[in-house]
């Protein structure tokens, strides 16, 4: 009996010990958790008690060897300071232009990311390995310090992100000033897309493509390729299309081993109100062209680069012709020196386009500069048929035979429909018809108008339950489109400046003086 009681008490005590041990483990875990939370709270209190940190831009070390450097030059709070570097940072780990955090006593305690805000500036010239001259948005020159990551990669014309207070360039913005003015990819326009200009296309292919497709023959005959081509003529007749097709044809002919580049420079975008800026941009464009032309190819062949100046008369005017500015007296010589100056221009061809060739300085158009001059005339009847066919393919819904439809439109477009009478001082009056102002751009617009009329007719037919669906573009649509196009052209150009009429009409005598213009309007 006593033994049974003793065993029962012993078992009860064991259970109590197990419960106490379990409770003790829980208390220990709670105590550990409380200690951790207390440490976190103490750390937060210490962090809140710390003074505010200051950020600065690292300018460089003050010692001789990176391994032993613990002094640094930083720019902070509007002044340059020499500060200490925390032992927790690896020696030599800081880079010029990097943002750093300064702790108590202005000690560098943390290396942060590079500065990513600031002003944009254009690099003009390198000064050694770590400095450069830039031009800011106000046109002022400034000497800045290049960040370590930029010292081997930037070149003249690049756009840099500059921290204005410290004067450190921290990043290259991947859009150079030349890239803002040019388009280096090859246009997707072929000669087959151009109608009515077979003669002009043949001339420019002989002038531009042959030197690159058959360089061995040119070397054999000691013949230098032309440096430039001038495309001139009335507006809207395909000058820009021809230039794009040249670049595309060269790219296709030479293949991937020596791709061509097409730098499309819009004349007005080169203009700048600051003295010397336009000339500098021209230098940058030709410098970029030389770099592209000198890039090695897979088979060692030549890499053609085409610089296309659109609206050339806007910037390269005859020297001395300026009324409120004499800008052309320095801009024109800059182009002349690039074309045939001391620095050789190899594998680079300049193509200019203008509809006011009489305004361009004669020195630019002499042989040795723009060697080839090709006039792009207004399309003839046959040329108009080819242009209609380019914009009006068989796949477009139409009524009847497409060829007959195009012939009808051409006859309507070239019908005798008087537009204006020009009165000359020393010659008989001359009647100009609407056909005298036909251009490729006008034909393209006529086709677009006819397509819109056909679409509207199809939509109207779809809303009504009766009637057959329209067959597509009809002769009536083309007639309406031609009439609308000619009606809109009735007062463009206006009679306010009679000389403008003589300049846009081919065949007018150069010495003829227009004394009056009589608009005759559209005849039904």
UniProtKB/Swiss-Prot annotation:
Residues 4-50 form a coiled coil. GO terms for molecular function: ATP binding; ATP hydrolysis activity. PROSITE patterns: AAA (PS00674). It comes from the Bacteria. InterPro entries: AAA+_ATPase, AAA_ATPase_domain, ATPase_AAA_core, ATPase_AAA_CS, NA-bd_OB-fold, P-loop_NTPase, Prot_ATP_ID_OB_2nd, Prot_ATP_ID_OB_N. GO terms for biological process: modification-dependent protein catabolic process; proteasomal protein catabolic process. SUPFAM superfamilies: P-loop containing nucleoside triphosphate hydrolases. The gene is arc. Belongs to the AAA ATPase family. ATP binds at residues 236-241. Keywords: ATP-binding, Coiled coil, Nucleotide-binding. Homohexamer. Assembles into a hexameric ring structure. GO terms for cellular component: proteasome complex. This is AAA ATPase forming ring-shaped complexes.
């Amino acid at each position: 009996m006593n033994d049974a009681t003793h065993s029962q008490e012993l078992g009860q005590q064991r259970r109590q010990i197990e419960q106490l041990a379990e409770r003790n483990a829980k208390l220990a875990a709670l105590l550990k958790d409380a200690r951790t939370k207390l440490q976190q709270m103490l750390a937060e209190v210490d962090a809140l008690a710390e003074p505010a940190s200051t950020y600065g831009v690292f300018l460089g070390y003050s010692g001789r060897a990176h391994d032993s450097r613990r002094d640094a030059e930083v720019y902070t709070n509007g002044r340059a300071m020499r500060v200490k570097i925390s032992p927790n940072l690896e020696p030599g780990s800081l880079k010029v232009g990097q943002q750093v955090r300064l702790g108590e006593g202005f000690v560098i305690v943390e290396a942060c990311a590079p500065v990513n805000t600031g002003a944009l500036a254009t690099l003009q010239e390198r000064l050694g390995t770590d400095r450069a001259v830039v031009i800011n948005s106000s046109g002022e020159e400034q000497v800045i310090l290049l960040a370590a990551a930029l010292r081997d990669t930037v070149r003249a014309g690049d756009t840099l992100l500059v921290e204005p207070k410290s004067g450190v360039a921290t990043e290259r913005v991947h859009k150079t000033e030349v890239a803002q003015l040019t388009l280096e990819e090859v246009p997707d326009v072929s000669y087959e897309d151009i109608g009515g200009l077979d003669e002009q296309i043949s001339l420019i292919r002989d002038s531009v493509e042959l030197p690159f497709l058959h360089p061995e023959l040119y070397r054999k005959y000691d013949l230098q390729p032309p440096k430039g081509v001038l495309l001139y003529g009335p507006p809207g007749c395909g000058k820009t299309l021809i230039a794009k097709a040249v670049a595309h044809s060269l790219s296709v002919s030479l293949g991937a081993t020596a791709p061509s580049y097409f730098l499309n420079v819009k004349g007005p975008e080169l203009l700048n109100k600051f003295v010397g800026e336009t000339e500098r941009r021209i230098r940058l464009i030709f410098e970029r062209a030389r770099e592209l032309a000198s890039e090695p190819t897979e088979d060692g062949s030549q890499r053609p680069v085409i610089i296309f100046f659109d609206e050339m008369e806007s910037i390269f005017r005859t020297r001395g012709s300026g009324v409120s500015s004499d800008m052309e007296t320095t801009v024109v010589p800059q182009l002349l020196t690039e074309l045939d100056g001391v620095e050789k221009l190899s594998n680079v061809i300049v193509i200019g386009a203008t509809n006011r060739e009489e305004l361009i300085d004669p020195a630019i158009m002499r042989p040795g500069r723009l060697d080839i001059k090709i006039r792009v005339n207004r399309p003839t009847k046959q040329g108009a048929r080819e242009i209609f066919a380019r914009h009006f393919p068989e796949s477009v819904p139409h009524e009847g035979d497409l060829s007959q439809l195009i012939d009808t439109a051409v006859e309507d477009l070239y019908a005798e429909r008087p537009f204006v009478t020009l009165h000359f001082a020393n010659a008989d009056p001359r009647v100009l018809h609407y056909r005298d102002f036909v251009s490729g751009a006008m034909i393209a617009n006529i086709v677009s108008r006819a397509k819109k009329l056909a679409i509207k007719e199809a939509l109207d037919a779809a809303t009504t339950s009766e009637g057959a669906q329209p067959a597509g573009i009809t002769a009536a649509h083309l007639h309406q489109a031609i009439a609308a196009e000619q009606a809109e052209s009735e007062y463009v150009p206006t009679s306010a400046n009679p000389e403008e009429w003589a300049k846009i009409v081919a065949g007018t005598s150069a010495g003829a003086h227009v004394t009056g213009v009589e608009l005759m309007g559209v005849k039904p």
